[in-house]
Regions:
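Gly/Ser/Thr-rich phosphate-binding loop
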Residues: 7-67, 77-79, 89-90
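Short proline/glycine- and acidic-rich turn/helix-capping motifs at secondary-structure junctions
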Residues: 223-232
Length: 232
Protein backbone atom coordinates (compact mmCIF):
# COMPACT_ATOMS: atom_id res chain seq x y z
CA UNK A 1 0.00 0.00 0.00
CA UNK A 2 2.84 2.41 0.83
CA UNK A 3 4.40 1.76 -2.58
CA UNK A 4 1.09 2.51 -4.31
CA UNK A 5 0.56 5.67 -2.28
CA UNK A 6 4.10 6.94 -2.86
CA UNK A 7 3.93 6.28 -6.59
CA UNK A 8 0.62 8.10 -6.85
CA UNK A 9 1.95 11.06 -4.84
CA UNK A 10 4.97 11.34 -7.14
CA UNK A 11 2.71 11.55 -10.19
CA UNK A 12 3.81 8.18 -11.56
CA UNK A 13 1.17 5.71 -10.31
CA UNK A 14 1.35 1.98 -10.91
CA UNK A 15 -1.14 0.49 -13.34
CA UNK A 16 -2.84 -2.33 -11.40
CA UNK A 17 -5.98 -2.61 -13.51
CA UNK A 18 -5.16 -6.25 -14.34
CA UNK A 19 -5.16 -7.25 -10.65
CA UNK A 20 -8.39 -9.08 -9.84
CA UNK A 21 -7.68 -10.72 -6.47
CA UNK A 22 -5.18 -10.27 -3.64
CA UNK A 23 -4.95 -13.17 -1.18
CA UNK A 24 -3.44 -12.83 2.28
CA UNK A 25 -2.74 -15.46 4.93
CA UNK A 26 -0.63 -15.61 8.06
CA UNK A 27 -0.67 -11.89 8.93
CA UNK A 28 -3.16 -9.46 10.42
CA UNK A 29 -4.71 -7.57 7.50
CA UNK A 30 -6.32 -4.44 8.90
CA UNK A 31 -9.50 -2.80 7.64
CA UNK A 32 -7.55 0.42 7.05
CA UNK A 33 -5.05 -1.28 4.72
CA UNK A 34 -7.83 -3.07 2.84
CA UNK A 35 -9.69 0.21 2.39
CA UNK A 36 -6.52 1.88 1.14
CA UNK A 37 -5.99 -0.81 -1.48
CA UNK A 38 -9.58 -0.56 -2.69
CA UNK A 39 -9.18 3.18 -3.16
CA UNK A 40 -6.52 2.41 -5.77
CA UNK A 41 -8.46 -0.27 -7.63
CA UNK A 42 -11.74 -2.20 -7.49
CA UNK A 43 -10.74 -5.82 -6.79
CA UNK A 44 -11.38 -8.70 -4.40
CA UNK A 45 -9.34 -8.94 -1.21
CA UNK A 46 -9.38 -12.47 0.20
CA UNK A 47 -8.24 -12.78 3.81
CA UNK A 48 -7.71 -16.41 4.82
CA UNK A 49 -7.12 -17.91 8.25
CA UNK A 50 -5.51 -21.26 8.90
CA UNK A 51 -2.45 -23.14 10.04
CA UNK A 52 -0.25 -26.04 9.01
CA UNK A 53 -2.84 -28.30 10.66
CA UNK A 54 -5.77 -27.07 8.56
CA UNK A 55 -7.82 -24.19 7.13
CA UNK A 56 -10.38 -22.44 9.33
CA UNK A 57 -12.05 -19.49 7.65
CA UNK A 58 -11.91 -16.63 5.19
CA UNK A 59 -13.40 -13.27 4.29
CA UNK A 60 -13.75 -11.42 0.99
CA UNK A 61 -13.73 -7.63 0.84
CA UNK A 62 -14.80 -5.51 -2.13
CA UNK A 63 -15.85 -1.91 -2.56
CA UNK A 64 -19.42 -3.07 -1.96
CA UNK A 65 -18.51 -5.09 1.14
CA UNK A 66 -16.99 -2.95 3.92
CA UNK A 67 -13.60 -4.16 5.24
CA UNK A 68 -13.07 -5.51 8.73
CA UNK A 69 -10.04 -6.52 10.78
CA UNK A 70 -9.63 -10.16 11.86
CA UNK A 71 -13.22 -11.13 11.05
CA UNK A 72 -13.83 -14.39 9.19
CA UNK A 73 -16.60 -16.66 8.01
CA UNK A 74 -15.98 -20.18 9.29
CA UNK A 75 -15.27 -23.13 7.03
CA UNK A 76 -17.58 -26.18 7.37
CA UNK A 77 -16.57 -28.39 10.29
CA UNK A 78 -14.97 -25.58 12.31
CA UNK A 79 -15.99 -24.93 15.93
CA UNK A 80 -15.07 -22.55 18.73
CA UNK A 81 -14.47 -24.46 21.97
CA UNK A 82 -14.45 -22.74 25.38
CA UNK A 83 -11.83 -23.73 27.94
CA UNK A 84 -14.56 -25.55 29.91
CA UNK A 85 -15.30 -27.80 26.90
CA UNK A 86 -18.47 -26.03 25.72
CA UNK A 87 -18.95 -25.69 21.96
CA UNK A 88 -19.88 -22.03 21.64
CA UNK A 89 -22.98 -20.81 19.84
CA UNK A 90 -23.18 -17.53 17.86
CA UNK A 91 -23.47 -14.53 20.15
CA UNK A 92 -21.80 -16.20 23.14
CA UNK A 93 -19.98 -13.84 25.48
CA UNK A 94 -17.25 -16.44 26.00
CA UNK A 95 -14.09 -16.82 23.95
CA UNK A 96 -12.66 -20.14 22.84
CA UNK A 97 -10.16 -22.08 20.79
CA UNK A 98 -10.79 -22.52 17.08
CA UNK A 99 -10.88 -26.16 16.04
CA UNK A 100 -11.12 -27.67 12.58
CA UNK A 101 -12.24 -31.19 11.66
CA UNK A 102 -11.91 -33.23 8.48
CA UNK A 103 -8.42 -34.26 7.37
CA UNK A 104 -6.82 -33.96 10.80
CA UNK A 105 -3.19 -35.14 11.18
CA UNK A 106 -2.43 -38.21 13.28
CA UNK A 107 -0.05 -36.21 15.44
CA UNK A 108 3.38 -34.62 15.71
CA UNK A 109 6.36 -36.89 15.21
CA UNK A 110 7.74 -38.04 18.59
CA UNK A 111 5.85 -35.31 20.48
CA UNK A 112 2.99 -36.96 22.36
CA UNK A 113 2.39 -33.99 24.66
CA UNK A 114 1.91 -31.48 21.85
CA UNK A 115 -0.14 -34.00 19.87
CA UNK A 116 -2.53 -34.50 22.81
CA UNK A 117 -2.92 -30.74 23.25
CA UNK A 118 -3.54 -30.01 19.56
CA UNK A 119 -5.51 -33.02 18.30
CA UNK A 120 -8.57 -33.83 20.40
CA UNK A 121 -11.97 -35.49 20.12
CA UNK A 122 -15.09 -33.45 20.86
CA UNK A 123 -18.42 -35.30 20.83
CA UNK A 124 -16.79 -38.16 18.94
CA UNK A 125 -15.28 -35.94 16.22
CA UNK A 126 -11.53 -35.40 15.93
CA UNK A 127 -10.40 -31.76 15.72
CA UNK A 128 -7.18 -29.84 15.36
CA UNK A 129 -6.74 -26.92 17.79
CA UNK A 130 -3.59 -24.99 16.77
CA UNK A 131 -4.04 -22.55 19.67
CA UNK A 132 -5.90 -19.55 18.22
CA UNK A 133 -8.59 -17.89 20.33
CA UNK A 134 -11.66 -16.18 18.91
CA UNK A 135 -15.08 -14.81 19.74
CA UNK A 136 -18.09 -16.24 17.86
CA UNK A 137 -20.25 -13.29 16.83
CA UNK A 138 -24.05 -13.32 16.60
CA UNK A 139 -23.92 -13.42 12.78
CA UNK A 140 -21.88 -16.65 12.83
CA UNK A 141 -18.57 -15.03 11.92
CA UNK A 142 -15.61 -15.01 14.28
CA UNK A 143 -13.35 -12.24 15.48
CA UNK A 144 -9.84 -13.64 15.78
CA UNK A 145 -8.15 -12.56 19.02
CA UNK A 146 -4.74 -14.21 18.72
CA UNK A 147 -2.58 -17.17 19.60
CA UNK A 148 -3.01 -18.33 23.18
CA UNK A 149 0.73 -18.91 23.65
CA UNK A 150 1.34 -15.21 22.89
CA UNK A 151 -1.33 -13.99 25.30
CA UNK A 152 -0.12 -11.49 27.91
CA UNK A 153 -1.39 -12.07 31.47
CA UNK A 154 -1.35 -8.67 33.17
CA UNK A 155 -2.89 -8.30 36.63
CA UNK A 156 -5.13 -11.29 35.93
CA UNK A 157 -6.38 -9.94 32.59
CA UNK A 158 -5.70 -11.72 29.29
CA UNK A 159 -4.43 -9.36 26.60
CA UNK A 160 -3.82 -10.45 23.01
CA UNK A 161 -0.83 -8.64 21.44
CA UNK A 162 -2.42 -8.62 17.98
CA UNK A 163 -5.38 -6.55 19.21
CA UNK A 164 -3.09 -3.97 20.82
CA UNK A 165 -0.87 -3.80 17.73
CA UNK A 166 -3.82 -3.08 15.46
CA UNK A 167 -5.14 -0.42 17.82
CA UNK A 168 -1.78 1.37 17.92
CA UNK A 169 -1.41 1.16 14.13
CA UNK A 170 -4.73 2.95 13.69
CA UNK A 171 -2.92 6.15 14.69
CA UNK A 172 -1.76 8.03 11.58
CA UNK A 173 1.64 8.70 13.13
CA UNK A 174 2.49 4.99 13.38
CA UNK A 175 4.17 3.04 10.58
CA UNK A 176 4.59 -0.33 12.33
CA UNK A 177 4.21 -1.87 15.76
CA UNK A 178 5.02 -5.04 17.68
CA UNK A 179 3.62 -5.78 21.15
CA UNK A 180 5.11 -8.17 23.72
CA UNK A 181 4.62 -9.08 27.35
CA UNK A 182 7.50 -8.30 29.71
CA UNK A 183 7.83 -9.68 33.25
CA UNK A 184 6.73 -7.17 35.85
CA UNK A 185 6.84 -7.34 39.67
CA UNK A 186 3.49 -5.57 40.07
CA UNK A 187 1.38 -6.92 37.20
CA UNK A 188 3.05 -10.28 36.52
CA UNK A 189 3.48 -9.11 32.94
CA UNK A 190 3.17 -5.67 31.40
CA UNK A 191 2.35 -4.66 27.85
CA UNK A 192 5.29 -3.15 25.98
CA UNK A 193 5.06 -1.81 22.41
CA UNK A 194 7.92 -1.43 19.95
CA UNK A 195 6.92 1.28 17.47
CA UNK A 196 8.31 2.87 14.31
CA UNK A 197 6.82 6.20 13.32
CA UNK A 198 5.55 7.88 10.18
CA UNK A 199 5.21 11.22 11.98
CA UNK A 200 6.63 12.49 15.26
CA UNK A 201 4.64 11.81 18.45
CA UNK A 202 5.66 11.11 22.04
CA UNK A 203 4.76 7.98 23.99
CA UNK A 204 2.26 9.66 26.31
CA UNK A 205 0.30 11.20 23.42
CA UNK A 206 0.32 7.93 21.48
CA UNK A 207 -1.03 5.99 24.45
CA UNK A 208 -3.76 8.58 24.97
CA UNK A 209 -4.79 8.48 21.31
CA UNK A 210 -4.91 4.67 21.37
CA UNK A 211 -7.29 4.78 24.34
CA UNK A 212 -10.07 5.53 21.80
CA UNK A 213 -9.66 2.08 20.26
CA UNK A 214 -9.15 -0.39 23.13
CA UNK A 215 -9.85 -0.78 26.84
CA UNK A 216 -7.51 1.04 29.20
CA UNK A 217 -6.05 -2.10 30.79
CA UNK A 218 -4.81 -3.23 27.35
CA UNK A 219 -2.81 -0.06 26.70
CA UNK A 220 0.99 -0.39 26.72
CA UNK A 221 2.72 0.53 29.94
CA UNK A 222 5.83 1.36 27.96
CA UNK A 223 6.61 2.29 24.34
CA UNK A 224 10.02 1.89 22.72
CA UNK A 225 10.55 3.88 19.53
CA UNK A 226 12.82 2.38 16.86
CA UNK A 227 13.69 3.27 13.27
CA UNK A 228 12.44 -0.08 12.01
CA UNK A 229 10.47 -2.87 13.71
CA UNK A 230 12.40 -6.08 13.11
CA UNK A 231 10.69 -9.46 12.83
CA UNK A 232 12.40 -12.85 12.77
Amino acid sequence: LDALNNAQSSGNPYNIESVQVIISSGVMWSAEVKQGLLEHHDMKLMDTMGSTEGGMGSSVTTRDNPPATAKFGLNPGVIVLADDGEILEPGSEKIGLIGTSGLVPVGYYKDEKKSAETFREVNGIRYSFPGDYAKLESDGTITLLGRGSNCINSAGEKIYPEEVEEAIKRNKEVFDCLVVGVNDDRFGQKVVAVVSLEEKIDAEALIEQTRKFIAGYKLPKEILFVDRVERA
